[in-house]
Amino acid sequence: VRILIGGYRPYEIGIFKPDQKEVTVLKAFIRNKLLEYIDEGAEWFIIQGYTGIELYAAEEIIRLKEAHYDISLGVLMPFHQFDDRYNEMDQALLQKVLAESDFKDYIYKQPYSNPGMFKHINRFLISNTDGALIFFDEEADAKVRFLYNAILEFSGENPYNIERIQFDEINSFIDSGFDN
């Protein structure tokens, strides 16, 4: 089973430093979700390599692999130079994730050229996975909205599992006794 992971960029959820407590909480929450998916038979986790939820998930997947879970990480980057605007720390994290991934490639083997690419990228990701774990609130104005809407459209005509995580669920996780 191949699971696509998508979600917020750090700035979309008020995260501006990697050592903020919110990052620790999100990673613990993501780890719990990953373990649920592994228990249900997930073998591959797919990300595009965007900062925030995707790279947090990648870090947790790598930790789980180091703990001998039999899972794989695929990084399907959207196009060449998609990470040009990443700061030095994010560039280093992406390079570490790519080095530890089991598969990495570009969906488009060229730099960005037109907005239509994103629609094709989303379609490619969805049609090559069995389900998605998406961190997204309807009220939030986030880039992941486009992926989420594409998944909804696809799942209307095809068997595709989608789990959408909203802020309420993360807050419940914190309230239930998450303690770092």
Q: Over which residues does each language-model region extend?
A:
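Acidic/glycine-enriched connector segments
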Residues: 3-179
